[in-house]
Structure formats: C-alpha cells, structure tokens
C-alpha cells in the first residue's frame, strides 16, 4: 500500500503545487498499477494503523478525522520543538503495523522491533494522501501520474472531514496544512507517531527512517506533504491532512486523508503558509530551509505554532497511523516502489531533469537530506504538499531552531527509551515518509533562509549528536542490510534518482513535480542507509569533495547523510537521516552511498566531524554553492556506480593518503569521478570501522603527507588510479635529464612505489571488501597505506617543509609516484636553492656550477640532501630504468637535475668546464639535446651562471662589454674582410660603388651639396615607398602597418662598447703617432729625421700631380683591388717583393758603407 500511496501521494503532492497538472502527469513515471498496489499496501497498513488513526483523529480537532477520534489531548502532547522533552506519543496500534511492513521490511531496517520510523507512516501517508485527498475538496490537483492517482484514491477517501484540511489540490500554493485551523498539535502527534513507530516493531521504517524514529515526524514535521521547512507543517500534513483521512479502516483513512487534504488547503490558505509554501516547495527537499526566501520567519513561527497545536492534538494518533503506515509502507514499498521505481537510468534521467529544473533552492545546503526511500517518495508527496511543507518547514525551521533542538533531544531520548535508538528527528532534518506522499524528505526546522537551514541543521547536529544513537553497530547492521540490498533493484541508484527527483521537485515545483513523482514512484522505497551512511562518511571525509551540481539536492541529502554519518557518532544534522543511515536501504549500493558522500555539506556553517569516519575526514565547512557547482553533468547512477566500483578498487590504494585532501579537490569532478574517487577515498579515509583507533593514525598520516594529498588530484576519474602504478600512465621526463636526477626521481618513485605497493595490496583487497560494511571494507588498506606512506613521508615531509612552488608540479603530477618524485626533486631543489645555494637562477635556469671545484659548497650541500636518499637511489638504480621520471616543466626539470648534476656529473664535465662555460645554451636547446648533450649543456649553463655570479657586477658588465665588443669586432672584421675580398659580390659591389660615387661627386660638387643631394635622394626613395605601401594596403584592405616598422623598432644606436673599442684603438694609434712625430721633429735620431724629410719632399710632387680626393679615390680602388689581386697572385707577388726588398737592402748597405756615420749607426 505504501508504495501505491506514496506514488499517488507523490503525484498528488507534486500535483498540489500550482504547477499545471499536465507537467506533473508528464513527469510522473510511476505506473498507476504500481501506485494502486502501493495504495492497497498502504490501505492494509492503514488498517493496522486504524487505531493509530483513531487516536490521530481524536487528537486532530480541526481535522475532524473520520477515523475513531482520539482526544487530541490524548495524542502526544503538543510537540514543542523548543521544549526539551517530547511528549510521549501514544503508541496505540503503531506496533501493530500492517504485516506488509514486516513482510517487506527492507534490509536497511535493522530490526522490525527497532525500526525507528524516520517519518511517521501517517505523516508519510498524509503528505501523499493529503494532496490527493485534499485535491477533490479543494482545487483538484493536476491529474497525478497514473501511479500517483491510484494511490491518492485509496488514501484520499474523505471519511472524516478534517479540520480545514489542506486540499491536495496539486498546487503548492494551497497550503497543505492550514496554520490557523489545521495547525494543531501536529508536532506532538508526530512525536507520538515517532514514539508509536518506535514501539511498532512490525512497522518497517524506510531506510532513512529506521534509525530516526524520533527524527521522523519531529524533525520531519515538515514532511513532503508539509512544507519541508516546517516540522509542524509536515506533521500537520501528515496528521491533519493525512491523519484526518486515516480511519480505522483503509477507506476511513483515505476519507480522513481526503478530508485532511481539504483541511490542508484551508490551512494552506493561511497567508503565512500560502506565501511560504510556494517558496518552500522548492526547498522542501533539498532547500527546505534555505529556499524559502519569501517565507518570513515570523510566518514560519506562526505556522509552527498552529501546526504544533494540531500536531500535539493529532500527532500521536497521526504519528501512530503515520508510523504504522510509514513503517508498513517502507516494508511494502520496496516491492511496490520497485515496481514504481524507474530503472536507474530513468531515475537518473528524472534526477537530471530535476537538477535542470532546480531553481533557487539549488542551495540544498540542508545536508540532512538522506537518500531515503522516502526521499524518493518525498517527490510524490512533495508535489501536493511541497508548498505547505516548505511554509511549515520554514516556520518550524525558525521555531525548531529555537525549540526543536531541545525538544528533539528530549524526544529522541524519550523515543530511544521507548525502544528506539534513533534520536528525535530534528525539525531541520527532512524526514522522507515511506508513504508515497511522505516519501519526500523535508526538514521541519528549515528556515525560509538558507542560513536558518544551515544553522538549524548544524546546531541540531551538534545538539542531537548525542541524541542520534545510531551507533557503529547500527552502521554495521546497515552495512549488512545494504550488502543484501545491493543485489535488489533498489540497490540501483534509486536513492540518487529519488532524491534527485524529489529535490528537483522541491526546487522546481512546476516542472520538477512531474519528474519527481515519476522518479519517486520508480524509486525503491529505501535509500540504502548504508549507502547514505557511507556516502555521508565519505562526504564528511571528503566534505570538501566534489559536489554534483545535478545532484544539488541529492548532495544535500547525501551531505546530510554524510554529515550525519560523520556526525553519526558525534553529531547528526538530522536524526531522521541518521535513521536512514542506521536503517540500511536496499536501494543504494555502497558506491552510490559513497558517491553521494562526495557532495559536500551544503554550506555547512562548521565542518562536521564524523566519529565513524576518520577525524581527518571531517570536511571543512564548504559553501554549498561553491561545491555543488562543479560537477554539472553527473553520469547516470549505473555508470557512476560502475565507474565508482572500478575506480574504487583501483583508487582506494592510490588515493588513500590523498583521499583526505583529494576530496576537496574533487569538488569539481563529475559525479562518477566523485563517486569513484569519494568511494575510494571515502572508504580509504573513512574506512576505519567504528573503533576509531585508525583515525588517529590516519590523522598522523594526513599530517605527514598533507602536501602530497593536496598535490594529488587522482580522485578525479581522469587520474586513472589503476594506471598510476604503471609506467605508461606516468609522464616520462625526457631522458635527456641527468641520470643523477633520474636516480633522484627514482628514489622518490621508489618511495612512492612502496606506497603504491601498499595501495595495490589494498586495491586487491578492496574489491572483496566492497560488499563489506563501509567502515570495515577499507580499514586494512588504510593501515597498509599509512605504513607505506609513513615510511616515505619522513623524508618527504622534511623536505616538503621547504617552501615549494606547487604550481610547477600541478601540470605534471597525476599520481602518487609522480607526486613523490617530482615533489622530492623540487624539495631537494628548494633546499639547494633557498636554503644555502647562493646560486641564482638565470634565464629560468637554476644555474649550478658544473664542477665541484667551482661550487664545493653547493655540491656538499646537495650531497647532504642526497645522503638521505642515496640508499633509495641505490636501490632504485637497478629498477629505476623501468620507471620513467615525472616530466616536469623545463625549469623545474632543470632545477631538479642540476643539484644531482653537480654531485654525479660535475666531475665528468669539470675538465671541459673552461670550454663549456664559454658556451651558453638556451633552455629550449637544452631540452632538445640528447641526455649527454643535455647534461653537458646543463653543466655549461651552471658553470656560466656560477661564473657570472662570482664576478662582480662591474666585472660582469666589463665582460659583457668586451664580449659584445669582441663579437662586434669580429662581425666588423669579418664583414670588412669579406667586402675587401669580395666574398659577397653583391654586397661588396654596392659598398664599393657607393663609396666611389661619393668620392667622385665630391670632385665635382662641394661636400655640402653632395650631402644635400644624397639626403634628398634618400628621402625620395623612402617617401615614395611609404606611400606606395600605404596605397597597396588600402586597396588590399590589409593591415600590415608601417613598411619600415621593423627598421624603426630595430636598435641602431652605436653601442658604448663598440665606440670604446674603436676609440681605444684609435687613441693608441694617435698617441703613437704623436710620439713618433715628436721624435722625428726633435731629431731624436738624425737619420730618421732625414728620412722623414725626404718623404715629405716626395709628397710635394705627389700633391702637385694628384688632388686629395683623387688620392682617396685611388686608395679606395686600391683597397678593393689589391687584396683580391694579392690573394690570387700571392706567390708571384711575394717573390717579386722579396727580390725588390733584397735589392733595396743591398743599395742601402752600399750607401751606408760610403757614409761612416750612417754605417756606424746602422751597426
């Protein structure tokens, strides 16, 4: 019945929002037959719950339920969220839940006796029923999906005109619960229902509900039918609308629900509720509290008050009815819901649609939403009562924040004493009711603002952490149940689908309601709490982990679950979710659980610590918006699950050390990658079983390898952890790098390999452990990983202390091995550079002295750095070749290489240092060189750098100047020689012709005229060309720019070095000439003076024959002709010159012999 009712309720609830019925119809995938079956099951449960309904009816003064009226006072006392104690809810027939519940008690329910109705069945049913029941009286809701309407019919028979019941008109605007009229002690009734549910061992609470009996209605007062934010409103929905419809017989219940639905519209008419409902509807599931923008807190408070009264009066009976219905329906719904459950693909599609349809409520900060079966059903219920729930949830969220924490604590205590370990549900905790309408999870304490939701959730979590008594035992039971449930269709991702759909419904009441109903009907009732639990744990562990954008609401649920899981021992956002966790749901597989875990706590005010999860796992508070935005296109659940399973085995070993920090980085990963990574990481990190002995170890490990975890980004599926240990997956550094560096990296990789081996061991064990409870599955791996990592970390962490620029590694690091190796290299590098290395990095090259002689200090220092790793290097040298070094940026690679180059290679190149240092190699050239060449180039660059550093700035400048001067001199010399010898005929011809023309022009015109003409000729050429190019560009519409731009931008200034060079040379010649002339004119040597006199006498004749320009012309001609002639006839010319020289000497000897003075001087 529950399945049918839930689907129908979901349909009605989805219909109840103002959305057009056709949209809902289209979106509802649920089949009418399935819903009818569920309705029948629900009717059966209602029969069992008749007594509860009677009590509820009695408690429901305004509802006027047709069922046997139980005095409202008799119903659980007004459930005051603020009150510390929760009035015991009359148990009544709750224990006598319809056999359907026991029959189908999902594996998530640990024990029929202890099934804590995460949501009172009546409440769950009521939300679903109210939309339908209320629809006929008020405005008929858009025809729910086939599956939804049948459910509504059985649940909707208006047997008793409830107090102005909210009409399940299918419009959210119509408050499913009327604050003034119907908001009677609904809260107490929910509490009572919870108590009753706790008493009802036969009642099977939905996976999310079992462990949260107290959380069910108390925190879930705003159930799907009720405004998700308003706990009371939810309860009113469940109690006023649905409970009133609940009668001793199924028909009576249905009638009562119908009447309650009628009452609900009236209540919905409440201006406060009406205003808030539309807004709340969006929030009902994922954003119950945060999405209610329009709902004033005052209104929320009013709603809470009214609903509290109604709930107090009706809560017990309704709770009993709802609990029994919910408990039964969760049990029955697994089958019915399975029927209604759309294939995981459909559910994923629906979920995607919901995601797409998600509106403002995208916040989904409410992490309390756990993937309940009810959460799926919540979609159905949500449609009809979403608005009401949202409004009430909003009201209740405010009131609940203040009161619910105490009241829930008391309630949880009372409920726990009543045989339920679950803590009182927190109003902020959305409690999906198993019944179709109740299926959606609503946070009673959600406030209209996200802040209130977050505040409520976290305070409640903190306050009720003790209240939530789901212990590691419960977790284990859930795990066991989950293992069994994994095989069932529910194990498919119904949680994600249902939650997603329901969340989308909350967010977008118009378009999502359709999808949510279909998705809800398709979803298995139970959201494997185990999955949720694991998801919560991994999420808490990876709270900063990726959040699936499409999973916005799912993330909320998952987050809440993860928070509850993580808080599970310590604090829980929502007891109802805790119950969901405690009650393993057969629907979701562990991977799904883990995958949702990835979703971060929605904008959690403070990070929630998850005792069951390693303390390190506690996710730092992360804004939901920032987190959820990243994974926008989640893969289908099946794909995600498959990928997660595969990646789980492979990445568990790999990411375990990384999982702590990787979760945060994975925020952007797609759902699949998130699921896989989170699963891996979550399991690895949160693997520790209830005994937290491993957590401290993990914490130590995390501390020891924080940087590694930060650097490691393997969590994303892109990292392909399986390949991380294979050489193929590791980027190879060009083997041009020095062997020393290779050894260094290899030593690092060796360490990483050790870790990898441990991880691989874990990976081999993990596939077998996948079926094991989440906490237990990976503990062994954690230990092994810790050991491996701890062994490697001492050296790495010490080096890591050195400030490193991680950006350089981000591009190349994809695996632990790579990370370790690259990190090790950089650490060494940083130590060498930053700590003691005086060497500066020039041109992006860490310039190291190639020879130990040049840099004994650096070599010694580097050797010291290497000493710790020498053993590792020695070990690795044998097998290092198999592992390619991590390819790092050029600068980084060189930095890593240089230190070892000094140690290992400096001797090799020390002999060549003088020649090597002279040559400079560019980084690009070095990277292109072969290993030896690269080593040599590195050494050269090192030597060059060191030399430059050793030199004083002035020395360096002088050397640079001399170098440039030499280069320019060489260029000039080479060019002049080439010109004189006509090496380049064109060039020489141009120079020779221009020079000769200039000299000839000077013979005709004055130098001034020649200069002017030359300038005009030049300008005429340049201007003409400039205009020509401009015209061409205009015609071609090209934008080439100035034709002489290159020349204009080129440096034409004469360098100071060049000037100094030539000036120094000229100055020397001038000085020597002056000295010589002084000697000649002062007759230092009479003979030399006479020779000079004869020479001058000869020039007098030459001057009479030749003009100065003529001489210049002759000299120019000779300059360009004699060298060529001499080069071609050098032998002959040398022979004749020798003969001439000999004859001249002979003549001089004769003359000197005749002149005694000359002879003596010659001697």
Curated annotation (Swiss-Prot):
Q: Where is the composition biased (Basic and acidic residues)?
A: 406-423, 461-474
InterPro entries per the UniProt record, alphabetical? Reticulon, RTN1-4
**Example GO molecular function term?**
protein-containing complex binding
Q: Which domain of life is it from?
A: Eukaryota
Q: Which residues carry this modification: Phosphothreonine?
A: 347, 429, 832
Positions with biased composition (Acidic residues)? 31-55
- Outline the segment boundaries, as ranges, of region: Disordered: 1-184, 244-270, 406-437, 454-474
Q: In which tissues is it expressed?
A: Isoforms A, B and C are present in optic nerve, spinal cord and cerebral cortex. Isoforms A and B are present in dorsal root ganglion, sciatic nerve and PC12 cells after longer exposure. Isoforms B and C are detected in kidney, cartilage, skin, lung and spleen. Isoform C is expressed at high level in skeletal muscle. In adult animals isoform A is expressed mainly in the nervous system.
Signal peptide residues are none
Which GO BP terms, alphabetically? axonal fasciculation; blastocyst formation; brain development; cardiac epithelial to mesenchymal transition; cell adhesion involved in sprouting angiogenesis; cell migration involved in vasculogenesis; cellular response to hypoxia; central nervous system vasculogenesis
The residue ranges for the Cytoplasmic side of the membrane come to 1-989, 1126-1163
Q: Which residues carry this modification: N6-acetyllysine?
A: 1075
- Modification type Phosphoserine: residues: 7, 16, 107, 149, 169, 171, 329, 333, 343, 425, 488, 689, 726, 766, 830, 855, 922, 962
Write out the GO cellular component annotations.
Answer: anchoring junction; cell junction; cell projection; endoplasmic reticulum; endoplasmic reticulum membrane; endoplasmic reticulum tubular network; endoplasmic reticulum tubular network membrane; glutamatergic synapse
Give every Reticulon domain span.
Answer: 976-1163
Q: Which PANTHER family match?
A: RETICULON-4 (PTHR45799:SF1), RETICULON-LIKE PROTEIN (PTHR45799)
Q: How does it assemble?
A: Binds to RTN4R. Interacts with ATL1. Interacts with TMEM170A. Interacts with RTN4IP1.
The function of this protein is: Required to induce the formation and stabilization of endoplasmic reticulum (ER) tubules. They regulate membrane morphogenesis in the ER by promoting tubular ER production. They influence nuclear envelope expansion, nuclear pore complex formation and proper localization of inner nuclear membrane proteins. However each isoform have specific functions mainly depending on their tissue expression specificities.
The identity of this protein, by name, is Reticulon-4
Upper classification of the source organism reads: Eukaryota, Metazoa, Chordata, Craniata, Vertebrata
